[in-house]
Amino acid sequence: IMRDNKISLGKIQAAGYQLTPSNDMIYNSLSVQFRDEIREESATEWETLLDTLAAIKPFFFRNHITGATEIFIQDLKNNAYLINAAGRVLWKVPLGERINGVVYMIDYYRNGKYQLLFAGRNNLHLLDRNGNYVERYPVKLRSPSTNPPALFDYDNNRNYRILIAGEDRMIYAYDRSGSVVKGWKPFKTVSTVSSEIS
């Protein structure tokens, strides 16, 4: 019984039991008081404060120098942060717009060093591990995006293609440098695309 009711029993703040004899009888009374709120100790190894609340779920980014996992996140003021494995903020970059969906870890220079690729409503962003934009980025999108970017590497040679749907209901394809793919003919969709293209 104790094991099955561990959560409920953990909420007990005080308990009392009383036996009272009266007129050849013994009366029992049990009084239990429960806590309104239980505060649990934090089991985290570290905590880091952002300027405000997180706006997106964290993305885990591999440090190509140390192999350690770092955390990329954006707050409600549209600042992007890279946080190391000890919880220290390595950098903070104002983006000017909310990240739309997924963040990709890519090898833009094809040298084993990674960058962060993502899109906002109006721009395609590519940041290096130090929080600097890769040349030519941010890239203004042809039409404000309505969905997260989709990343493709057809030949596994890091010649990336990025597909994004626009507010104009057209599907656009960009290459790794942010240019529209030569030979790609944007096509119109029947309705607005809000999910990632696959």
Language-model features: where?
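Charge-dense polyanion-binding interfaces
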Residues: 4
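Extracytoplasmic/lumenal domain signature
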Residues: 8-13, 20, 25-198
